[in-house]
């Protein structure tokens, strides 16, 4: 019997992101804090992304018609979720440019979803692990590289910001949480490299992508869930 490895790992991710969403939402309601609200909505959308992906993966569904319908939704949920979190971070660091940052990130969401409305990669399974490839070069191919161009730049900037927050934080739990976010985002960057270069081009087994997802989810679970506490306003306003 083949075990749906990717599906089980993504299911774990669903619980992690939804739990984080609940925690930040409670913080938002208690503190009436704008940043906590964006984090809550962002984690909720990312969790929805994994719900949409996990359902067919658990049952090894590789029907192109199914993925053609689901792909625009999960890409929209994933991109929108991280964009909300990124907007909360960058708009607090550069408040005078918050509107421009919002427009920029909105364009990234639209450009990321656009190609999946016209073309969907081929999804298949290798020993219970989800893999994907391009059967042919689509006419919207340049748009597929939008996330791979801007996401590393955005994640790299956020990694630096959270490392600095961890370095300057006085509260131990705040320090752990900021450091955990930075490390998790580093592994997200590593995951992009694994997916795009090693697996797609280098023909490496896709299980390494799953392992990277598992590392990210585990880091988030330990650093954010188990070190959670209702932050005081002076910390939240600094995104700590």
Regions found by a protein language model. Give the residues of each.
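Juxtamembrane loop-transmembrane helix junctions in multi-pass integral membrane proteins
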Residues: 1-7, 27-34, 62-72, 132-142, ...
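Secretory targeting signatures
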Residues: 1-2, 44, 50, 180, ...
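Extracellular-loop-to-transmembrane junctions of the mid-late helices
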Residues: 2-14, 114-161, 206
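Individual alpha-helical transmembrane segments in multi-pass integral membrane proteins
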Residues: 3-17, 33-113, 148-149, 204-222
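Alpha-helical transmembrane segments of polytopic integral membrane proteins
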Residues: 18-22, 83-86, 156, 160
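C-terminal ends of transmembrane helices
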Residues: 21-30, 86-90, 167
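Juxtamembrane "helix-exit" motif on the non-cytosolic side of transmembrane helices
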Residues: 55-63, 118-129, 193-203
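C-terminal transmembrane-bundle signature of multipass membrane proteins
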Residues: 150-168, 172-240
């Amino acid at each position: 019997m083949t075990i749906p490895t990717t599906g089980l790992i993504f299911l774990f991710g669903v619980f992690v992101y939804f739990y984080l969403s609940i925690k930040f939402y409670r913080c938002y309601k208690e503190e009436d804090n704008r940043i906590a609200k964006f984090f809550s909505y962002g984690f909720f959308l990312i969790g929805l992304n994994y719900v949409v992906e996990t359902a067919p993966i658990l049952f090894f569904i590789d029907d192109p018609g199914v993925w053609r319908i689901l792909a625009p939704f999960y890409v929209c949920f994933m991109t929108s979720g991280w964009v909300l979190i990124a907007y909360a971070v960058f708009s607090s660091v550069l408040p005078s440019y918050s509107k421009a940052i919002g427009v920029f990130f909105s364009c990234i969401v639209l450009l990321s979803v656009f190609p999946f409305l016209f073309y969907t990669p081929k999804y298949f399974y290798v020993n219970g692990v989800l893999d994907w490839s391009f059967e042919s070069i689509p006419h919207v191919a340049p748009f597929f590289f939008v996330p791979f161009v801007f996401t590393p730049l955005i994640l790299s900037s956020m990694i630096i910001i959270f490392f600095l927050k961890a370095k300057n934080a006085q509260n131990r739990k705040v320090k752990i949480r900021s450091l955990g976010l930075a490390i998790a985002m580093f592994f997200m960057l590593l995951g992009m490299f694994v997916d795009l270069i090693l697996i797609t081009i280098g023909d490496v087994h896709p299980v390494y992508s799953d392992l990277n997802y598992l590392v990210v989810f585990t880091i988030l679970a330990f650093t954010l869930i188990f070190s959670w506490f209702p932050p005081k306003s002076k910390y939240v306003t600094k995104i700590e």
